[in-house]
Design a protein with these regions (language model features):
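N-terminal glycine-rich phosphate-binding loop and ensuing alpha1 helix
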Residues: 2-146, 163, 168-173, 209-211, ...
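Conserved beta-loop-beta/alpha segment of the NTase-like Rossmann-fold superfamily
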Residues: 65, 144-149, 153-247, 275, ...
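Fold-independent oxyanion-binding glycine-rich loops
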Residues: 70-73, 168-169, 198-201, 232-234, ...
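Conserved beta-strand scaffold positions in the cores of enzyme catalytic domains, especially
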Residues: 101, 164-166, 228-229, 330-334, ...
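Short, well-ordered beta-strand micro-motif
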Residues: 103, 133-134, 232, 243, ...
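Well-ordered alpha-helical segments embedded in enzymatic catalytic cores
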Residues: 119-123, 180-184, 256, 319-320
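Residues at the starts of beta-strands that form the adenosine-phosphate
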Residues: 132-134, 194, 331
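Catalytic-core segments of class I nucleotidyltransferases/pyrophosphorylases
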Residues: 249-366
Length: 367
């Protein structure tokens, strides 16, 4: 039974998921179609079947918001720009511009990496046609439109899709985390069925995101109690380790930034880590961002969340993930490739990022 197989791959048999990476979308399609009679009775999803993965994806795109968070300049990024200038390398770049606009090799509109596109173009392209876009920014909307969205439109011989820019407020001089960003823009995604969250500096794979979205919907249609699916990669010494229980369900997510520098597991061998992509049931995400805002917001100060770095005053999506996992309603799908865990957080990261996106885009283009 396809539903049981999909549930195993997102649970106890998580170690087999990567080998099935290329079949996950078809498996989710088969599981969803098999669930149609069940959903008609239980009303857990719209009771219909689909003739292809493409048809299934188009159906879900109408019920999904893709929430892409584009970072501002950031102190680490600005420092790396200054260091590159002192060394006489790196590309000329205004340090007040967002990191996501920094030019890197273009594998999206060319196959050889000729020309340049901004870093964030890869995250934007990875959610192409998967839902309505909400792009969280700190200004620079005109440049993002002209330098990222319009070129991707032209390369796709179509359009990136409906999109809305949202500027995250920074009440105390700095943004207070991506969880706070999700809360601030909640009116733009609360009416959706699913929210795909990703970040503008990551080497995202469209195949990973599509497979994860379809898998969560199929699991929900089959009666699985899941509010979050995180595509994961198996890597040595993960900085953001995922702890699984005996059933293969995630119970804890390590996050060094939130916990000071004590969050990472020192000396660990191979383990699972997230690659910066999350797929939520929108209703669950809305409930949890509202919970954190109402329970942990201190007027005039920021967030005070137990377990977080007290000095940061931030609210992260990782906090939401932890609560969903504690309720047993999170799943991992260990289909992500290690290349997807190659973010561009400093100028020194750019060569590795370019190698990673070349590999990721090549696979996404393959049949």
């Amino acid at each position: 039974m396809k539903a049981a197989e999909l549930a195993r791959l997102a649970g106890a048999d998580h170690g087999s998921a990567l080998a099935a990476r290329g079949q996950i979308a078809e498996l989710a399609l088969a599981a969803r179609n098999a669930s149609a009679p069940r959903t008609a009775v239980l009303r857990t999803a719209e009771p219909r079947s689909f003739g292809s993965v493409e048809e299934y994806a188009r159906f879900l795109a109408g019920r999904t918001v893709c929430l892409t968070l584009l970072a501002g300049a950031g102190s680490r990024w600005v420092a790396s720009l200054a260091a590159a200038r002192e060394r006489g390398d790196g590309r000329p770049f205004d340090p007040t511009r967002p990191r996501g606009l920094y030019p890197v090799r273009d594998f999206l509109t060319t196959r050889e990496g000729g020309g340049a596109v901004p870093i964030a173009a890869y995250a934007i392209a990875a959610t192409r046609d998967l839902g309505r876009r909400v792009i969280v920014v700190r200004g620079w909307e005109r440049e993002i439109e002209a330098e990222i969205l319009e070129p991707i439109d032209q390369a796709a011989a179509g359009h990136v899709g409906e999109r809305t820019f949202f500027e995250q407020e920074a009440p105390f001089g700095k943004p207070l985390g991506h969880g706070d960003a999700a809360w601030q823009c909640r009116s733009l995604w609360a009416g959706a069925e699913y929210v795909v969250a990703n970040f503008g500096g990551d080497a995202n794979s469209r195949r990973t995101i599509l497979s994860s979205l379809l898998a969560l919907d199929a699991l929900c249609a089959c009666g699985q109690e899941a509010d979050l699916l995180i595509p994961a990669a198996r890597v040595p010494d993960p900085a953001y380790p995922i702890r699984l229980d005996e059933a293969g369900l995630p119970r804890d997510f390590g996050h060094a930034k939130l916990r000071g520098h004590a969050g990472a597991s020192a000396g660990a061998s191979f383990g699972y880590t997230n690659v910066g992509v999350r797929v939520y049931r929108a209703s669950a995400l809305l409930g949890w961002v509202t919970h954190f805002r109402s329970r942990h917001w201190v007027p005039g100060e920021g967030y005070s969340i137990p377990g977080n770095d007290a000095a940061g005053k931030e609210f992260a999506l990782d906090n939401v993930d932890a609560m969903i996992a504690a309720d047993g309603r999170a799943r991992i799908l260990a289909i992500a490739r290690p290349e997807e865990l190659t973010p561009a957080k400093s100028v020194d990261d750019i060569p590795a990022f370019e190698r990673a996106v070349e590999s990721v885009v090549r696979e996404d283009r393959a049949p």
